[in-house]
A protein has these predicted regions:
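Extracellular and secretory-pathway beta-repeat/beta-biased strand scaffolds
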Residues: 2-470, 476, 481-484, 523
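Surface-exposed repetitive/solenoidal architectures
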Residues: 331-804
Length: 804
């Protein structure tokens, strides 16, 4: 009879002890393999038998030192019989800003217990292994690479952006000393094991520990520079200290160990042109994080840590202090040890994204089996390739402003996946939001959810409820299915290429009254016979969406036309359109759309932080963003497409006709009005064709092109200002501007109607438009303000555009 299985916690402890035992066995065997080299260092020792085999330079011995001189920024390759440095010895490479590759061809490993320095870049390659002893000090001005893998001389001498190293020798690279590069990277590379138990510093570069049979080095200032091919099953261990702009530990199909100890063992600090980034990668193996990792950018903001492996393990001191921590693994269960690591990191202000991939035949499920609670603004995303589940008796809670996202089908492939909550989600003390996303053919089990009764949506977010459940839209077919339940909540699970078969794609929805969150994704190559969502009702919300395509052939019965919607009476937030919208003139059975916009035809709701670069052409009125703003609000939005009205009505760069409110917005597209523009028919305006509403803190810069016109020429802001009703008087405030040079307009408003005034808009030159002080006190260009003036810009842009 077999003995009873120990409890789960005991089994985890046994696995940790076994894992630690294997780790120390790896370290011990690696050190043992190089121990004989240490024994030979009683007397001083210098590299022996060096000869240039590519490039040119001089090698000279001076007592306890050796100096290699290589002129200018050249490259060179030296082959050595041995390359070791005794405790009281030094080797100096005076190689300017060039690079020198040192290859050891003898049969002994390299042991560096003295000083090794270079003005430029330095490569040391020894297939027998390399150890930097406790007294060893290495410093370079450029990149330092120490490797048991070899590289082709010709490839090295050519330079360029990439270099491949390969080898099959079971040797290790070990650092017990101090290795630094003041201006470049530090790379430690081996097939069997790379161990850092000393100090590595690269304030302006990347510190990389990589184990594998083949490694690609690639120059990059913003992403990973080293890529390890599967094979070798090597081990990377850090039990020392690493501080660099970026840090990477990779073992491909081996194991990565980030060990614990005093303080932060791995710290990425970033530079002006490199974000602070840490990578822990073992796609076919295991990453074990036992200590604290820190990543920050040069400006003090939080950096990024990416952890990806077939298996993930965390010790009792594991934590990440950064802006973002991304974890990726085939499937995952958040048990006690994981929950503690995530909780410590979330409380430190680190937002976390855990994603399962379903790789290696795994289920791709993501389960929460241990409770998680934290305070503060950090957010947690749990995204599963298959299902997400919260176990019975488990609680996820936040007190602060943190968000929680539970997403099934993270790959967006319509697996029919579900979000299952058998536990409790407590956001009663949080001002953040909770989102659950499942496939249209999947399901949702709500469990116990506690929301905050005093919650209110952040300004301009387009949010409606604190806790929202969405069905994922991953395909064109899913998009069409929205029409079956137009009052539901939907979210784009991925970018959708809507390239049509022969014929046009009919509108997805005739009338939409639910929530549609694009999640920042794009629907591209739309070819619409009408708008995408038809009419957006009073309770309808569309947010965080990009759409690209063309809309034409609107029904003869259509009164309004736009790429996103014919009419909007709800809320549109952070939606951006590109492409073209075309509506033609009188038809056999109807007059066709009266007003056409790049985003919507008629706006009676709210549009905020949105834009259109679509070209708009209409027989009647046309606007770059909105055809007619009918008692609606357009705020913090812009349009830059060309706008054309081919007959009878006017056109505006942002809005055709305004009867509502336009504020903190602008237009830069060319406005064409043809052929009728006279004292009877409306002409073009840089911002609006005509207005009987309110315009404030807005401007226009686009050329106004009208072949004929009445005296006074085009209006830089509007063709006319009118008082059509007491509830809609025409008001143009003094913080409205137009560029007198680019628009070709000498007046802001051409004419007035029904007792309105010309308003207080002001003309500025292009140079004045590029100077923040020209816009007066109402334009806020400060941190957190509405406006920004990028270097070299000829006009302001909206602050939110900087984040795109």
């Amino acid at each position: 009879m077999s003995p009873p299985e120990p409890p789960r916690r005991t089994r985890r402890a046994l696995r940790r002890r076994q894992s630690n035992a294997r780790l120390w066995l790896v370290i011990g065997s690696a050190l043992t393999g190089l121990s004989f080299a240490h024994a030979t260092l009683a007397a001083g020792k210098l590299p022996q038998g060096g000869t240039y085999v590519a490039g040119a330079g001089a090698i000279a011995s001076h007592g306890d030192g050796l100096v290699v001189t290589q002129p200018g920024s050249t490259r060179g390759v030296i082959e050595w019989n041995s390359f070791s440095i005794g405790r009281n010895n030094s080797v100096t490479f005076d190689n300017g800003s060039g690079a020198t590759l040192n290859r050891v061809t003898g049969g002994s490993p390299s042991a560096i217990f003295g000083r090794l320095s270079a003005t430029g870049s330095l490569y040391v390659i020894n297939p027998q292994g390399i150890v930097v002893g406790p007294s060893g000090v290495i410093s370079t001005g450029g990149r330092f690479v120490v490797s048991t893998l070899d590289v082709c001389n010709d490839a090295f001498m050519q330079g360029g952006g990439s270099l491949t190293l390969s080898g099959d020798r079971d040797a290790s690279v070990i650092n017990l000393g101090k290795v630094s590069s003041s201006g470049g990277d530090v790379f430690l590379i081996a097939r069997r094991a790379v161990i850092n138990a000393g100090t590595i510093t690269a304030p302006n570069g990347t510190a990389e520990l990589a184990a594998g049979e083949q490694v690609l080095l690639q120059d990059s200032g913003s992403s990973r520079q080293v890529f390890v091919q599967m094979g070798g099953q090597g081990t990377v261990v850090n039990r020392g200290h690493i501080k660099a702009a970026q840090v990477s530990l990779q073992a491909a199909d081996g194991n990565v160990y980030a060990l614990a100890g005093g303080g932060t063992r791995i710290r990425a600090t970033g530079t002006a042109d490199r974000d602070g980034h840490v990578w822990l990668v073992a796609d076919g193996g295991r990453v074990s994080q036992l200590g604290k990792i820190s990543a920050s950018n040069a400006d003090g903001s939080g950096g990024t840590v990416d952890t990806q492996a077939a298996q993930l393990a965390f010790g009792k001191h594991a934590a990440v202090h950064a802006g973002q921590w991304n974890l990726s693994t085939p499937d995952f269960t958040i048990d006690d040890s994981v929950a503690h690591a995530l909780q410590r990191s979330l409380n430190a202000g680190t937002s976390i994204d855990v994603t399962t991939t379903g790789a290696n035949g795994a289920t791709g499920d993501l389960g929460v089996a241990s409770s998680l609670s934290w305070s503060g603004p950090a957010s947690l995303t749990l995204a599963a390739y298959h299902d997400v589940s919260v176990a019975t008796g488990t609680t996820i809670a936040n007190s602060g402003a943190g968000n929680l996202t539970l997403r099934a089908d993270a790959a967006g492939i319509d697996n029919g996946d579900s979000v299952i909550n058998n536990g409790t989600i407590d956001w009663s003390r949080s001002t953040g939001i909770v989102r659950a996303l499942h496939d249209i053919t999947g399901g949702y089990l709500p469990g116990n959810i506690h929301s905050n009764s005093t919650w209110s949506a952040p300004p301009d977010s387009g949010l409606v409820t604190q806790v929202t459940v969405y069905a994922l839209v991953n395909t064109v077919s899913d998009l069409g299915a929205v029409g079956l339940n137009p009052s539901g909540n939907y979210a784009l699970g991925r970018d959708i290429d809507a390239t049509p078969p022969p014929g046009e794609f009919s509108p997805a929805v005739a009338s939409f009254s639910g929530q549609f969150d694009g999640m920042g994704h794009t629907i591209s190559h739309l070819w619409l016979s009408g708008s995408l969502l038809g009419d957006i009702g009073y309770s309808g919300v569309v947010r965080n969406l990009n759409i690209e395509g063309s809309a034409a052939n609107f029904p003869e019965s259509a009164t309004w036309a736009g790429l996103l919607a014919d009419t909007n009476y709800g809320t549109i937030a952070s939606v951006h359109s590109s492409g073209s919208v075309t509506s033609i003139g009188p038809l056999s059975t109807g007059i066709g759309p009266l007003s056409t916009g790049g985003l919507v035809g008629l706006n009676g709701g709210t549009i905020t932080r949105s834009s259109s670069t679509a070209d708009v052409s209409s027989y009647y009125a046309a606007g770059g963003l909105v055809g007619t703003n009918s008692f609606g609000v357009v705020r913090e939005s812009f349009a830059s497409g060309d706008v054309t009205s081919t007959h009878y009505q006017g056109a505006g760069g942002l809005v055709g006709y305004n009867f509502g409110v336009i504020t903190e917005s602008y237009a830069t597209g060319t406005v064409h009005v043809q052929p009728q523009c006279d004292t009877v028919n409306a002409c073009g305006g840089g911002l609006v064709g005509g207005t009987s509403g309110t315009i404030s803190q807005s401007f226009a810069t686009g050329k106004i092109d009208q072949p004929s016109g009445p005296a006074g020429g085009p209006g830089g802001i509007a063709d006319y200002n009118a008082n059509y009703s007491a509830s809609s008087p025409g008001t143009i405030t003094g913080d409205v501007y137009w560029d007198t040079q680019t628009t070709g307009a000498t007046v802001g408003v051409r004419t007035t109607l029904l007792g309105a005034t010309l308003g207080d808009a002001k003309g500025l030159t292009t140079m004045q438009m590029s100077t923040p002080s020209s816009f007066g006190p109402t334009y806020d260009f400060g941190p957190g303000g509405v406006w920004a003036m990028p270097v070299g810009a000829t006009h302001p842009i909206l602050q939110w555009q900087l984040a795109q």
